[in-house]
Amino acid sequence: MIEAWGMTMEKSMYIKIEEHMLACMNDGAHDCQHIYRVLYHALEIAKDYDVDREVLIAAALLHDIGREAQFRDPRLDHATVGADLAYDYLKKIGWAEDKAQHVKACIATHRFRAESPPVSMEAKILYDSDKLDATGLLGIARTIVYKGIVMQPLYNVDDEGNVLEEDDDDHQHSFFQEYNFKLKKLYNRFFTEKATMIA
């Protein structure tokens, strides 16, 4: 059993979940190193709270497994798709319904643009941990890599050559718009005090 961080998940179960995550990750901006950084932050933040660490670890490992579906169809929300995929996978490998549902809820609400904010402490910690990986220079670098993968420009200009700060219907979403919409606002959107301090 893995007993670090106050949890008792069987090592074989942890390895199964990790292997499933590794099989699903093929995006340079949301690769396994992103997942491991999110997991590290989640476990660090969780030291201050009484949380279900098995749920938190599974949610951290599986939170981006819906990315490939979103790449194939940009209308999809990777958090919603990933939540369903994670739930199905956890049930398949023998997780209890309540824990699998809890992981599903954490993943479904981890996205910055999610209409439903995270409710449980595990979900709030996952959200904060994922957003920590979007802060600072690393966050900017990851966003530029992602924009390259999905073939979106660094910035858009209007007919007069002025850089557009917001999205409009005539232009693709750009890095500059993502920075203005998300990256510079992250620091006021954390749920835990520790994440705010780390950021």
How should these model regions be labeled?
Residues 12, 24-51, 62, 115-199:
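Divalent metal-dependent phosphate-bond-processing catalytic cores, especially two-metal-ion Mg2+/Mn2+ enzymes
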Residues 86-127:
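Hydrophobic, well-structured mid-protein blocks that either form specific transmembrane helices
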Residues 22, 39, 43, 66, ...:
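Amphipathic alpha-helical segments within well-ordered protein domains
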Residues 14-18, 39, 79, 83-87, ...:
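An amphipathic alpha-helix signature
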Residues 1-8:
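Short, Lys/Arg-enriched N-terminal segments with co-localized hydrophobic residues
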Residues 20-25, 68-71:
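A short, mixed-charge helix-start or loop-turn motif at secondary-structure junctions
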Residues 53-72, 78, 82, 86, ...:
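His-Asp-centered metal-binding catalytic motifs of divalent-metal-dependent phosphohydrolases/nucleases
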Residues 28, 72-76, 93:
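Short gly/ser-rich anion-binding loops that grip negatively charged ligand groups
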